[in-house]
């Protein structure tokens, strides 16, 4: 399947641009108000006690600001943040090298934390609970455990698949936050702020139109903003007006609901099953897509907006999907 403009993964060329558009202060971070409020209280209390923050877990679909909010936490705590990802921590020595280089109150951010191996988790437990690193030297009867004290630090874990976390690891987080999709008004404000940073003039209705098609996700909103900006430049227009915006979004294949070809193919597959549950492996095979991508990228927004139901037997299209695709149900009074 061709690359999606509404793909939720960060593309390589976007990394530096994302950093430049990233909010640096609470007042710059739009949305997630309940999470922000709770974090501000926790940060204030930790600073008054002169302690590190409790370990915390952020979970939810990609692109909702887990990394950005972690950077703000570090700035508010006036400390350093070390960013890594679980797939990069292959051996206990990798984790030990990271932990022993942390300073007091530093923040360690581990993305995709659900992908840590059980062996790495075992090393992490005493580090989280007792700020102690247990290293085993040798093997068999001659093996010895060396205990190394660590400075108090805060572990921030981020995951798109909280259900895959082991219970012992999940229980060691003092705070757990579910990141929510953003409203169109929040996304419109994010888009206008980003456009200002890019020195790009944009009409209010253009920002609103991009926001409507951004699947409740800032990462997608910023990506669409930059692509529409390219169209405006090619059209020799210094202003992103509604006409250019609509033309660009239609050319990019993103409809009024934020759906693209992959979303519509997914929904058509379910709707044509006429109420019969469709298994994830069947969907993945039909779409030639990875099961994890379907679960983490395609389904969350569709599920949150009522276009499908997940059951023990598989996925089922809702009446909302049948109405959208104009695919009638064979027996609507008994299907749902």
From Swiss-Prot:
Record keywords: ATP-binding, Cytoplasm, DNA damage, DNA recombination, DNA repair, DNA-binding, Hydrolase, Nucleotide-binding
Q: Where is this region: Small ATPAse domain (RuvB-S)?
A: 183-253
Which region ranges are annotated with the description Large ATPase domain (RuvB-L)? 1-182
EC number(s) stated in the UniProt entry for this protein: 3.6.4.-
Matching entries from SMART domains are given as: AAA (SM00382)
Query: What's noted about domains in the record?
Result: Has 3 domains, the large (RuvB-L) and small ATPase (RuvB-S) domains and the C-terminal head (RuvB-H) domain. The head domain binds DNA, while the ATPase domains jointly bind ATP, ADP or are empty depending on the state of the subunit in the translocation cycle. During a single DNA translocation step the structure of each domain remains the same, but their relative positions change.
Give the protein's recorded name.
Holliday junction branch migration complex subunit RuvB
> Gene for this protein?
ruvB
């Amino acid at each position: 399947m061709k690359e999606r403009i509404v793909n939720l993964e960060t593309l390589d060329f976007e990394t530096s641009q994302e950093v430049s558009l990233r909010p640096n202060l609470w007042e710059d971070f739009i949305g997630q108000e309940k999470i922000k409020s709770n974090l501000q209280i926790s940060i204030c209390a930790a600073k008054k006690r002169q302690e590190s923050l409790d370990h915390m877990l952020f979970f939810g679909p990609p692109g909702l600001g887990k990394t950005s909010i972690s950077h703000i936490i570090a700035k508010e705590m006036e400390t350093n943040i070390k960013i890594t990802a679980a797939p990069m921590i292959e051996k206990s020595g990798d984790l030990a090298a990271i932990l022993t280089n942390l300073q007091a109150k530093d923040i360690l951010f581990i993305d995709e934390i659900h992908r840590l191996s059980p062996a790495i988790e075992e090393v992490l437990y005493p580090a989280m609970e007792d700020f102690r690193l247990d290293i085993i030297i040798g093997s068999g009867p001659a093996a010895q455990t060396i205990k190394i004290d660590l400075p108090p630090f805060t572990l921030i874990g981020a995951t798109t698949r909280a259900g895959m976390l082991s219970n012992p690891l999940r229980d060691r987080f003092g705070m757990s936050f579910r990141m929510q999709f953003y409203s169109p008004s929040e996304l419109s404000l994010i888009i206008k702020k980003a456009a200002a940073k890019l020195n790009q003039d944009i009409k209010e209705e253009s920002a609103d139109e991009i926001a409507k098609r951004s699947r409740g996700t800032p990462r997608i909103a910023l990506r669409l903003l930059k692509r529409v900006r390219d169209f405006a430049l090619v059209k020799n227009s210094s202003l992103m007006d509604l006409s250019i915006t609509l033309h660009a979004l239609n050319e990019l294949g993103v409809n009024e609901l934020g759906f693209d070809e992959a979303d519509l193919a997914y929904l058509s597959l379910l709707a044509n099953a006429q109420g019969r549950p469709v298994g994830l492996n069947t969907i993945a095979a039909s779409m030639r897509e990875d099961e994890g991508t379907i679960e983490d990228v395609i389904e969350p927004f569709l599920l949150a907006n009522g276009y499908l139901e997940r059951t023990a037997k598989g996925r089922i299209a809702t009446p909302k999907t049948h109405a959208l695709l104009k695919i009638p149900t064979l027996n609507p009074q008994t299907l749902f």
